Regions:
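A short small-residue
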Residues: 26-29, 106-112
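Active-site-proximal beta-strand/loop segments in catalytic clefts of secreted hydrolases
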Residues: 64-66, 87-89, 103-107, 164-169
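Stable alpha-helical elements in mature extracytoplasmic
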Residues: 4, 8, 19-27, 40, ...
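Acidic/histidine-rich catalytic neighborhood of metal-dependent amide-processing enzymes
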Residues: 110-185
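A non-catalytic alpha/beta surface segment that caps or lines the substrate-entry region
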Residues: 12-95
Length: 185
């Protein structure tokens, strides 16, 4: 762990209009109710995947799907979908590099009805999308320079980034060990 200086943080590019709550390309599509297993959740998943496919095609996309019963849904299984977006050096097999892992959850609460959860989950997801876009060219540059210098191929040198967007963090009724963290277990 190393604290980041104020000067370093000032170098992070602004998200600008992408974070506008009404029209922002990154944030606005997430500002809807997105309870796990609902159409809103599927819509937000599609937003994430489309962003990475169109804007960051060198990033791999992986789904980790599961189902679980919840106290609010009784015997009905609810689907949960975690998304993993990963950028690794082109010379490594997928999952074989040292990965800086950035994580947020994207689901919103079951109650109250139409809860959005902007600052708890929507904004962190938009920030991670912005971070991925901001660092992508530097990852490309680093990987290109390492390839030109014939570096890499060792555990210490093979570095990448992965972003986990998790589903089912919120409790459906009351936060307990069994009614929470469905996607992060």
């Amino acid at each position: 762990y190393k604290p980041l200086s104020d000067n370093f943080l000032k170098l992070v590019p602004s998200g600008g209009e992408d974070f506008d709550i009404h029209n922002g390309k990154l944030l606005a599509p997430i500002l809807i109710p997105r309870v796990s297993g609902t159409p809103g959740s599927l819509e937000v998943q599609e937003h994430f995947v489309n962003f990475f496919r169109k804007e960051l095609p060198k990033w791999s996309i992986e789904w980790h799907n599961s189902t679980s019963k919840t106290p609010a849904t009784g015997d009905r299984d609810i689907p949960f979908a975690n998304l993993i977006f990963r950028r690794e050096p082109p010379w490594v097999k997928q999952g074989q590099s040292n990965l800086l892992t950035l994580v947020a959850h994207y689901d919103s609460k079951y109650t109250p009805h139409d809860f959005i959860g902007a600052t708890d989950s929507a904004v962190p997801c938009a920030i991670l999308m912005h971070v991925a876009r901001s660092i992508d060219r530097y990852l490309t540059q680093m990987h290109d320079e390492m390839a030109a210098l014939e570096e890499g191929g060792t555990v210490e040198m093979d570095m990448g980034v992965q972003i986990l967007l998790l589903d089912g963090e919120e409790a459906f009724v009351q936060w307990t060990d069994f009614d929470s963290l469905y996607g992060a277990r």
